[in-house]
Structures are given as structure tokens and as C-alpha cells.
Amino acid sequence: MVSASNPPLLSQTKGQFDPARQNATPVKINKEYLMINTFKTAAISAVLALGMASTAVAQELRFFTIGTGGTAYTYYPIGGVIANAISKPPGSRECGDGGSCGVEGLIASAVSSRGSVDNVNAIISGLRDSGFAQSDVAYWAYTGTGTMEGSEPATDLRTIAALFEEHIHLVAMADSGINSVADLAGKRVSLDEPGSGTYVDALLIMEANGLAIDDLTPEALKGNAASEALRNGKIDAFFVVTGYPTGSLVELASAADIKLVPIDGDAAATLTEKYGFFSSSEIPEGTYEGVAGVDTVAVGAQWFTSAKADEELIYNITKALWNDESRKLLDVGHAKGQAITLDTALAGVGVPLHAGAERFYREAGVLK
């Protein structure tokens, strides 16, 4: 049973991972870096239309941020869909009358960020109300193990829901001669920024294949910047951990002859055996135009908040996430939205549930 008092433990031993010690120190977050995205949409428009005509209405208004990732990756649009689904600004029409079916008085917004590590740190520091993170990054942060060994455990981190699988993409030009992770030796490879879950997993994958960061020339590029650098010959390959299909790779595949490099064999088996949050999976052929499918490994994308967040608020947010109207928005809002289901809401959860989320899942019969 997953609960704040009885958190499940993954097959993780403290101190097993060494090459990523440079990522053990929490990322210092520059507030000016954050970009509140355009997904405030109809919710904010409705409030502006009201003109905040009365003090009573103004007092009912509450904002709630969701840290996502780079704008070219899956976290960002999914965050926008969820923000819309859980929002219901003061003065909105009732749900049954065709209005929003979110939380009364709430305006949620998706926030672009560096990714998983950045979001976890922002939640713990109070900079963001919630955020998405890879299951491995969150577990290590919560326990102070793995890549977070030496950091103070983020014991206030709490889970709202498991969302979808994220697949590790290793991308190279089709004629690059890079056919395996081992072929990255001596190459220029983008590992994403140190504040991202991709960076963490890239180091783990290289370690499993006998490579250290000193065996290649690392770069720290995200999304479209990595794609452009690959097209222009400035890098030889790049990693990205994201739900497929992701926008930056859809665009890249339509403009250039690329390949996905498999992450498989003994190295993949070692990863899935050593770390319980990794699973063997595949990126199917046809996901990206003209690109063959490959075997790879995957991790879970999950939604987190702080234990300090109001129980009633998180209960209502969780309830709104899983109502019928939210289901419709998820199904049409993004290809990965269909994978976000109540049946898998607790899949792979290694950080305790927030008390408000736990209450909803018990009422819904998901937790017994």
C-alpha cells in the first residue's frame, strides 16, 4: 500500500552510483529563467473578463504552478492540458452547463523549467507548487541516495499521480556510424542540462556500457537546440528522456535523415535489474517519420508536490484530474494524454502520496 506512512521502496541501494556525483548538489534556480507559459488560456481570460469586479471574487482566486520541462518536450504540453483541466476561475460557468470542471477558484499554469531535478528542488524550496519528474530522480531525491547521495533527503516530497512512461531516446544522424552506446566514445554528445532527468539517466546508461563522461565530449543542450546542433554537425548524438512522440524529434525527423540508437542487450538488462524504476521497452517504427523502431529503456513520469501543500486543495486537484471532462481533454490534448489513466495512477510510485491524493484514491477504490 502506498501512503505517506508506508512508502514503497524500490530496489535501490545507497551509494551504488558514482559518476554522477557532479549532479548530486541541488540545482540553484534562477527565478528569471522561469517562463510562465501560454497555457493559462481560457482560465486567465475568464478572470480578466470579469475584471475582478468584487473583493469577494478576488479573495476566492488561487494560483497553482506545475513545473514541466523544456518547451520542445512532452512535459510542457501535458502540463498545459492538466493545468486547463484542473482550473476553474471565479465566475466560470458550472461544469454541468459546459463550463470548467476543475477546482473552484483555481488557476493552474504550466511552467517551463530545466526538468526533473529542477522541479524537485523548486517544490522543496517552495518556488513551485508542484512539478513533473522522472520516478528515478524523485526517489533518489526523497531518499538522498543514488545521484542525490550527499544531499539532504527531500523528505517533504509527495506524489499526486503517476502519469506516463518516458522513453530514453539516443539520437544520431543516419550516416554517423553510431550504432550502439559504446560507439559514443570520442564523440560530441549532448547529455542535456545537469538539472534534467535526461542528464542523470544518460550517465547511468553510459556507465552500464562501460563509458565515463571523460570518454566523450559532453554538451548540455535541450530540445530544439540539440536537434539543430545535430543537423549542423556541431554534435554527433544527443540523449533525451521523454514520452514519444516528442515535438522536437518529430520536426527533426521530417527535416533530416536521423536514427534512433538502441539501448539494449546486457547493459539494458543490468540497468533494469539494478534499478527498479527502469523497464525494458521500445520506441515503435513509425513514431518518427522514416525512423526505424528500437529497443530502449523507460522510466515513469510522475506528478509531485510538497507535503506542506494544503490537503483539501490537493484532494480537489487529484479529483479534478480524474473526472470525465479531464479525460476528454487528456485524450485530445496530446498523444501521451491517452496513457494517463486512473488505473495506472499509482504505477511505479516510490515516493509517498500526498495526504490529499491518498484520500481521493481510497475513495475511488484505487487504494484499499
Language-model segments: which ranges?
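An extracytoplasmic/periplasmic, membrane-proximal ligand-sensing/linker region
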Residues: 10, 19, 221, 225, ...
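A structural signal for short loop-to-beta-strand junctions that line the ligand-binding cleft
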Residues: 149-163, 286-295
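Bacterial N-terminal signal peptides
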Residues: 45-51
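Pocket-lining segment of extracytoplasmic ligand-binding domains
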Residues: 135-137, 145-146, 176, 212-304, ...
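Extracytoplasmic small-molecule ligand-binding "clamshell" domains
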Residues: 77, 81, 90-123, 290-291
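Sec/Tat signal peptide C-region and signal peptidase I cleavage site
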Residues: 54-58
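Bilobed "Venus flytrap"/periplasmic-binding protein-like clamshell domains
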Residues: 63-98, 162, 166-232, 327, ...
